[in-house]
From Swiss-Prot:
Native source species: Bos taurus
InterPro entries in the cross-refs: Rab-GAP-TBC_dom, Rab-GAP_TBC_sf, Rab_GAP_TBC_domain
Name of this protein: TBC1 domain family member 14
Region annotation Disordered: where it falls in the sequence: 270-303, 315-335
One Gene Ontology cellular component: Golgi apparatus
Domain of life: Eukaryota
Highest classification ranks of the organism: Eukaryota, Metazoa, Chordata, Craniata, Vertebrata
Major site of localization recorded for this protein: Golgi
Assembly information from the UniProt record: Interacts with ULK1. May interact with RAB11A and RAB11B, but does not exhibit any GTPase-activating activity toward these proteins. Interacts with TRAPPC8.
Length: 692
């Protein structure tokens, strides 16, 4: 056992020592040392005031408080006790313990007389201490008879029993260290105090049989201690594990007889019973089941509404300090309460039906998506060239492509007419990174000029890319600086500006590239992005071909008037031209205006039908909200169409698109657009939308 450490071996008793390494802590005499018993085991006993001389007090502990030990006794019945009086023989420098009392009754209080010759004027409050030469050991003959062995440099040590029945506290005010080993099946208080502070007593509680057993264990341990002292400083190498095993064995042996935590098993009269039997007997007596209830017992087997919150809000009776309710008022309140419960049940039933319907729709959608994935992977994609235009594939396409195969289908549908390879993407990306570095380091303008495009134009494109990326799907927070897709989006847009310097970067491209990146790898997204922007409609808008853009607007108005004549007239009356709302929709392919999942479904059919579906989708939106739009003026219509509602119903939206007929006087979209392109060269005002 090392200095400053105190160990215990019963019921989780823990001892802690506090080292005091100040030099010169020597006490010459032991004034008085008595271990006392209180009159009651629940309260401390106060003794007469004792004063020590200033010389003796000068060697006492001054850096810590006087130490207030605590006594917590939960057992109100008398317990067999044994009290120890420790006295010093006048002829020997040894402290000999004396058995003072052992009975099953409560002990009388005892307080020693004040020492003679004490100077009360110069005395201060301080604890009595053991002299270094006054003793070798102090043995407490309690049921946990152990040894107080002298060591060095301790000022205060306290013992607190972790037993749930009683509490044990040992407080020793001494200039020397005390290594204590306390073994107790009950609890006790040991206080070596001789001052003005409250006088606490040394009490150990146990039975006689347990006392003898513990004394035998202590005697064996004392014999081992003498052997270990012969080994000198190497003793701890041989006993480090053996002592721990013995202490653990005693702990296991005695913990079986004690109380379980939280009072599950009280200490019975027959301590030899098995702990499981005691547990069962106590549970039977208390009427509690031996096994915890199954979690399934708490699960509601039906979904019937139980208005628990409503019943908690309604009080049946008034408080006792108020007059009782009249019979009429009580009946009225009871009826109101029943009506509230009925309404609550109706609301809960309606909500449950709504949730059940949503769950059924979700399950049906997941099942249809799973079946569609199998169909696309096993039947359509292996035979793409022969099946992509079949009626079955078109029907599946309209219902929406499963996300797991969407990127592959988009790549096949868009095609690669430009024959862009992954190596070309790497070259364009490397050139873009080189230009970014040159701009950041202030490179010369001559190094960055290429194909007639000045460095200022390229720098403007790079700044616009940086600004536009930060505004791309801001709610997702994945394309902004530090997001997982920021670098990928920056690479695709930068590589495209190097691939098509004549087009450069136009605001709105970031949304198209972002949707492709969410479904394809970076290189494949770049290939699809380049081929998609090479389509006639996208090239007209991104190159800002004003004449061709007006032709597309004129073709749109032809089918607008054919399908929605009433709304078309309302727009004409308020001078609402298509460019107010179509430019944003076409530039971003609805990825900015519609929710992302709905925009992806629009992209699915757009990859199948081409640019015609973009204008058909616009007519479907106008048809879906035509009742609202006809009651709005110019400003409100423009605001509504540029900021569509976020909770668009997908099925109603696509049903509205399906109702749009893309035929006008037996002419389809392509035929009408071609005719308008021819007429635009001859007649600049061939359509109302072309009038300036």
């Amino acid at each position: 056992m090392t200095d400053g450490n105190l160990s215990t071996s019963t019921n989780g008793v823990a001892l802690m020592g506090i080292l005091d390494s100040r030099p010169g802590n020597h006490i010459q005499n032991l004034q008085h040392l008595t271990l006392k018993a209180p009159r009651s085991l629940s309260l401390p006993e106060y003794g007469p005031k004792l004063k020590l001389s200033a010389l003796e007090d000068r060697h006492s502990l001054q850096s810590v408080d006087s130490g207030i030990p605590t006594l917590e006794i939960g057992n109100p019945e008398p317990v067999p006790c044994s009290v120890v009086h420790v006295r010093r023989k006048p002829s020997e420098s040894e402290i000999v313990p004396e058995r003072a009392c052992q009975s099953a009754c409560l002990l009388p209080s005892y307080a020693p007389p004040a020492p003679a010759g004490a100077e009360r004027e110069q005395s201060v409050r301080k604890s009595s201490t053991f002299p270094r030469t006054g003793y070798d050991s102090v043995k407490l003959y309690s049921p946990a008879s152990q040894t107080l062995q002298r060591s060095d440099n301790v000022s205060v040590c306290s013992v607190s029993s972790l037993s749930t029945e009683l509490s044990t506290t040992l407080s020793v005010s001494n200039e020397d260290i005390l290594d204590l080993v306390v073994t107790s099946s009950s609890s006790a208080i040991v206080t070596l105090e001789n001052d003005d502070d409250p006088q606490f007593t040394d009490v150990t509680l146990s039975s006689t049989r347990e006392t003898r057993d513990l004394q035998r264990d202590c005697a064996g341990e004392t014999e081992e201690g003498r052997k270990l002292r012969l080994l000198g400083p190497f003793s701890h190498f041989f006993t480090r594990n053996s002592l721990a095993r013995k202490q653990n064995a005693r702990l296991d042996k005695q913990s079986d007889l004690g109380w379980k935590l939280f009072g599950k098993v009280p200490l019975g009269e027959n301590a030899q019973k098995d702990a499981k039997k005691l547990q069962k007997e106590y549970e039977d007596k208390a009427g509690r089941p031996s096994k915890p209830p199954s979690p399934k017992q708490n699960v509601r087997k039906n979904l019937d509404f139980e208005p628990l919150s409503t019943t908690a809000l309604i009080l049946e009776d008034r408080p006792a300090n108020l007059p009782a309710k009249p019979a009429e008022e009580a009946q009225k309140h009871r009826q109101q309460y029943e009506e509230m419960v009925v309404q609550a049940k109706k609301r809960e039933l309606k909500e449950a039906q709504r949730r059940k319907k949503q769950l059924e729709e979700r399950c049906r959608l997941e099942e249809s998506i799973g079946n569609a994935v199998l169909t696309w992977n096993n039947e359509i994609l292996p035979n793409w060239e022969t099946m992509w235009c079949s009626r079955k594939v078109r029907d599946l396409w309209w219902q929406g492509i499963p996300p797991s195969v969407r990127g592959k289908v988009w790549s096949l549908a868009i095609g690669n007419e430009l024959n862009i390879t992954h190596e070309l993407f790497d070259i364009c990306l490397a050139r873009a990174k080189e230009r970014w570095r040159s701009f950041s380091t202030g490179g010369s303008e001559a190094e960055t000029e290429d194909a007639g495009f000045s460095a200022a134009d390229r720098e403007a494109s790079l700044e616009l890319i940086k600004l536009d990326i930060s505004r791309t799907f801001p709610s997702l927070c994945i394309f902004q600086q530090g997001g997982p897709y920021h670098d990928m989006l920056h690479s695709v847009l930068g590589a495209y500006t190097c691939y098509r310097p004549d087009v450069g970067y136009v605001q709105g491209m970031s949304f198209i590239a972002a949707v492709l990146i969410l479904n394809l790898d970076t290189a494949d997204a770049f290939i699809a992005f380049s081929n998609l922007l090479n389509k006639p409609c996208q090239m007209a808008f991104f190159r800002v071909d004003h004449g061709l853009m007006l032709t597309y607007f004129a073709a749109f108005e032809v089918f607008f008037e054919e399908n929605l004549p009433k709304l078309f007239a309302h727009f004409k009356k308020n001078n609402l031209t298509p460019d107010i709302y179509l430019i944003d929709w076409i530039f971003t392919l609805y990825s900015k205006s519609l929710p992302l999942d709905l925009a992806c479904r629009v992209w699915d059919v757009f990859c199948r039908d081409g640019e015609e579906f973009l204008f058909r989708t616009a007519l479907g939106l106008l048809r879906l909200f035509q009742d609202v739009l006809t009651r709005m003026d110019f400003i409100h219509v423009a605001q509504f169409l540029t900021r569509l509602p976020e909770d668009l119903p997908a099925e109603e939206f696509f049903a509205s698109i399906a109702s749009i007929q893309m035929q006008s006087r037996n002419k389809k979209w392509a035929q009408v657009l071609t005719a308008l392109q021819k007429d635009s060269r001859e007649m600049e005002k061939g359509s109302p939308s072309l009038r300036h």
